[in-house]
Amino acid sequence: MATPHINAEMGDFADVVLMPGDPLRAKHIAETFLEDVREVNNVRGMLGFTGTYKGRKISVMGHGMGIPSCSIYTKELITDFGVKKIIRVGSCGAVRADVKLRDVVIGMGACTDSKVNRLRFKDHDFAAIADFDMVRNAVDAAKALGVEARVGNIFSADLFYTPDPSMFDVMEKYGILGVEMEAAGIYGVAAEFGAKALTICTVSDHIRTHEQTTAAERQTTFNDMIKIALESVLLGDKE
């Protein structure tokens, strides 16, 4: 039945949901890549859709910006609508010279300055990691598509406008591939409620060089990332 934030019924969502931050990007993904699409959520404008990809039922829904927002939607999808796998498909900022604009990054793990996982893990450090099989399937899908994807640690920041830019130097030293705002929270929610999760990002801006993509491009042109996510779902079904 409907929750305070999702006006859908059990069965409206597939067991796998792709989740961009922007609900308009969710709409674009559904209309571009899925067939037999129907809208399954529109509460607060957080659009959700279900359709099929090569005959496989898949859903896509926005999760908003930041860990608090994405945690609400992912928790409700898992506990109230039976979702088993969540793939965040979003953007990130690069801090390393060898990571370029529009590179695809697969978040094997997610560091964070947020305290949410310490709250759920009795004030201990929780290793926020993606599901191994989902990572492997995404890597295999990228190779099959001829897309060079980077795999490693990303950083989920609570603040978009950071007061301490020297932290980017630390991130670079520790090999962080990209900075975003949600993955660590999604991985924590998935672990808490027995689901699986993965984050795939496209580099939308470079924090060092100040290169950036436009908002319109972020909404519509990060197609390699979406294809990797969708094809990885099909590979997962073969296991």
From Swiss-Prot:
PANTHER family in the record: PURINE NUCLEOSIDE PHOSPHORYLASE DEOD-TYPE, URIDINE PHOSPHORYLASE
Catalytic activity: a purine D-ribonucleoside + phosphate = a purine nucleobase + alpha-D-ribose 1-phosphate; a purine 2'-deoxy-D-ribonucleoside + phosphate = a purine nucleobase + 2-deoxy-alpha-D-ribose 1-phosphate
Single GO MF annotation: purine-nucleoside phosphorylase activity
Residues marked Important for catalytic activity (site): 218
HAMAP family hit by this protein: Pur_nucleosid_phosp
Gene Ontology CC terms: cytosol
InterPro entries: DeoD-type, Nucleoside_phosphorylase_CS, Nucleoside_phosphorylase_d, Nucleoside_phosphorylase_sf
Entry's family note: Belongs to the PNP/UDP phosphorylase family.
Binding site for phosphate: 21, 25, 44, 88-91
Official protein name in the record: Purine nucleoside phosphorylase DeoD-type
Coiled-coil regions, chain positions: none
Lineage of origin: Bacteria, Pseudomonadati, Pseudomonadota, Gammaproteobacteria, Enterobacterales
Role according to the record: Catalyzes the reversible phosphorolytic breakdown of the N-glycosidic bond in the beta-(deoxy)ribonucleoside molecules, with the formation of the corresponding free purine bases and pentose-1-phosphate.
Subunit structure: Homohexamer; trimer of homodimers.
A biological-process GO annotation: purine nucleoside catabolic process
